[in-house]
Amino acid sequence: MDTCTDQSVSPEESLDASPASASPAAKPQPRSEPQPRSEQIAQAIGTTLLYIVPAFVYLRFASAADFDIWWHLRTGQWIAQHHAIPHVDLFSSATMGRPWEAYSWLFALLNFQLFQRLGLSGIVVYTAGMILAITVALHHLVKRLQQDFSIGLLLTGAICLTMGRLYVPRPWLFTILFSVFELNILMHVRKTGRLRELLWLPAIFALWANVHIQFIDGLVILGIALTESLLTLRRTATRIPLRPIALTLFGCVLATLLNPYGWHIYKTAHDLAVQPGAFNLVSELQALPFRDISDFSVLFLSFACVAVLARSRRLPIFESLLFLFAAIVSFRSQRDLWVMAIAAAAILASNITGRKTPHRLPAFSSLLFVPVAAAALLLASFALHVNNARLSARMAKTLPVRALAVAKARNYSGPVYNNYDWGGYLIWELRLPVSIDGRAGLHGDERLHRSRVTWTGEPGWATDPQLIRAGMVIAPVKAPLTQLLRLDPKFKLAYQDDLAALFIPANGRPILPMLPPDLPPPVMH
């Protein structure tokens, strides 16, 4: 039973009943706090700590050295300067003028505004804020499905730990957040039949389509809900009626068209999904390496999902298809491990039997803990000295900050030849067209392969047309190409530090890139 009887005795009262306290001379003891209050205080403390810890761990190792954030910042700056959305590439010499869709334009603009006001700290503010939002949303999803507070708290914490490697300043944090929103709505509607919550989904997708291309994953989840309704027309206990879910999916597809590129964004999503070279060459797109605890967490969560689904009397169609989709996506690419994480949160929370926690805090109470957690994280950032100076020092250990300072001081010109990882930072810092950067979909498999061949010093490296025409080569000091250029009489070493080497043509006369006459110059001040 969940209710307490009048005969229940608290531990404090049992102590009062000891022989010493029962003597006639003993003074009456004050009545102890009622048990419900102590339980709710414990829940409040546990919830607040849950909200703080994931973002605190990020702040402990916070860095602004993410490779891709820099070309996003440059895109946001261009949008702010021109009050327009780019439709052609402006940043790479190899793809200058080709059609390009900045599908994360809203993310880029948001982060540029934060950077403009707060400097490198703005990047940390975005990331920590999104981690807090994801944690709160995930806990709300789990609480709606799991009646045991302790199980819900531990499960949410485990999911947050699993996604730890994704806590970097990327637009996929929005995708994780919106996916949790979507799954929360779908699971609650399936459980309660309250269809009005479905009205939130088109608005979510309209925003989603302007911050990250992986809104496609959200549409797949909606498609799974529709499939369940089609396959269980005679069952209504755990499905959404066919007409509402079909209209919701249609409305969400229409909502995604409210972006600067219209339906063309679906072609971009298709091209990215079927680009095999990127999944083999780009580390974050490769399969899980199982060298980190979060990798094994994904595996253990998937085992747990199989166990709870297998013991069901009747195969739960939505949960089973959701798990299958999550397994395919997450084990294909480590960047998408979040799909299995949030799918496991929903599946396990709704299927693990726990003790119903009496005296639970009101549903709205979690919102009261958010500002407390935010204030604690702000204080933690000061205590950990998370400031622009510290972030700059950390960034200089990963990105060629000093080498680029020398290149700008000496007025070295392009074309620039660089590797894949550093291209985004060069776009931001040098304001010269780069040879390649983190936009794998724009450059295509052929360019990615050509760059890898050159940088690893494989046969034919010296025939790379972009290397031949380079006016400046910025190279990791330990890269195979760097050692080859030291011996190449066509290049001379202009600068070197512990991280980067800077080469220029030995004859001192680089060939400048030709820009299409109908395009603005890529250098914009």
For the regions a language model picked out, list residue spans one by one.
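Short hydrophobic alpha-helices at membrane interfaces in multi-pass membrane enzymes
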Residues: 188-206, 242-247, 317-324
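Membrane-interface alpha helices of multi-pass inner-membrane proteins
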Residues: 56, 159-163, 197-213, 251-256, ...
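Short periplasmic/luminal acceptor-recognition loop of GT-C membrane glycosyltransferases, typified by
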Residues: 408-446, 466, 470-477, 503
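Membrane-proximal, lumen/periplasm-facing interface regions of secretory-pathway glyco-
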Residues: 361-410, 422-424, 428-430, 440-442, ...
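Transmembrane-helix signature of polytopic, membrane-embedded enzymes
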Residues: 50, 138-161
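Transmembrane catalytic cores of multi-pass membrane glycosyltransferases
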Residues: 68, 80, 85, 213-313
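Membrane-interface transmembrane helices that cradle and orient dolichyl/undecaprenyl
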Residues: 180-197, 304-312
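Transmembrane-helix motifs of polytopic, lipid-linked glycan transferases
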Residues: 125-145
